[in-house]
Regions:
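Short edge beta-strands and adjacent turn/loop segments
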Residues: 33, 39-40
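Short secondary-structure junctions
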Residues: 28-34, 74-78
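Alpha-helical macromolecular-interaction surfaces
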Residues: 21-22, 266
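Short, solvent-exposed amphipathic alpha-helical segments in soluble enzyme
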Residues: 24-28, 109-112
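Solvent-exposed loop and beta-edge segments used for protein-protein assembly and interaction
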Residues: 3, 29, 44-46
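Short glycine-/aliphatic-rich beta-strand segments at the starts of folded cytosolic domains
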Residues: 2-14
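One-carbon transfer enzymes
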Residues: 40-288
């Protein structure tokens, strides 16, 4: 381990006086230098949230001593906390169906270094030939077809691949299969979905065509954590785009794809950088 290494610390707990002082003192006593610190006090829930980036100077043993001492502080205040090397890449499994715009975008952003992650696999319910035009850059590809009769067996295989790859994060990149309550619970807080939001009245097939028929003036997308409540998990990122009466259904589909890919990428990046903390059914998202 290098003599100087940046680390990220995130924490949440019931709010009370002395939290910041205790954290800062512990880091200082172990020779750490705080580079960035953000915090939020939720008046509604009474919870305190913080994200701290710090430099650590010392050997591995000293780092373990820091973690040991910090765990005592965490116990005193009731922290839910994570401390990890900033350079450590989260392992990401991507699930996709026929629409590949989000998959293409995520792979491209990873390839150019915009998404600092370690892709461990792509699971699709369509064969590799469907994505023949995409250079997956060596990411393992798993074809798991699904029918109504085989859905539970297929989902068991999905979970097996996630476990075997030791994936930290699962991304539903326009994966058009609804996860069971059981799998959603297993992936709680680490499975991100992209949904065509701002179209709440248009469910089912061809939502953008339905929106066009109603003459909407805005379309958008929402990236959220997956829960057992379909498309109602804690929101991470959203965006919208203005629609004109001149726009055709194809225009709405095109604009919708663009919004979906950029919203999903932003949400994933924030998760990878530990900027998202859960606050009940909501999220606290610290700015970059």
């Amino acid at each position: 381990m290098p003599d100087t290494a940046q680390h990220i610390l995130t924490l949440s707990c019931p709010n009370r006086p002395g939290i910041v002082a205790a954290v800062a003192t512990c880091l200082f006593e172990h020779g750490c230098n705080i580079l960035d610190a953000q915090q939020f006090d939720s008046i509604e829930t009474g919870q305190f949230f913080a994200r701290i980036v710090f430099d650590r100077v010392g050997e591995t043993a000293k780092y373990e001593a820091l973690r040991t001492d910090f765990s005592r502080v965490a116990q005193d205040f009731g922290f839910k906390w994570l401390m990890r090397p900033r350079a450590e890449k989260k392992r990401v499994m991507i699930l996709v169906s026929k629409s590949d715009h989000c998959l293409v975008d995520l792979v491209y952003r990873w390839r150019i270094g915009e998404l600092d992650m370690a892709p461990v696999g792509i699971i699709a319910n369509h064969p590799r030939e469907t994505y023949a035009h995409i250079d997956l850059d060596g990411i393992p590809f798993h074809y798991l077809p699904v029918t109504r009769e085989t859905k539970m067996e297929q989902e068991a295989d999905v979970w097996r691949l996630i476990r075997e790859a030791q994936a930290d994060v699962v991304v539903l990149a326009r994966y058009m299969q609804v996860l069971s309550d059981g799998l959603a619970a297993k992936l709680s807080g680490r499975c991100i979905n992209i949904h065509h939001s701002f179209l709440p009245g248009f469910k089912g097939a061809k939502p953008y065509h339905q929106a066009h028929a109603r003459g909407v003036k805005l379309i958008g997308a929402t990236a959220h954590y997956v829960t057992s409540d379909l498309d109602e998990g804690p929101i991470i990122e959203q965006d919208v785009e203005t629609i004109s009466h001149r726009d055709t259904p194809d225009d709405l589909v095109r604009k919708g794809r663009d919004i979906e890919r950029r919203v999903l990428a932003r949400a994933l990046r924030k998760h990878l950088e530990d900027r998202v903390l859960l606050d009940g059914q909501k999220t606290v998202v610290f700015a970059d």
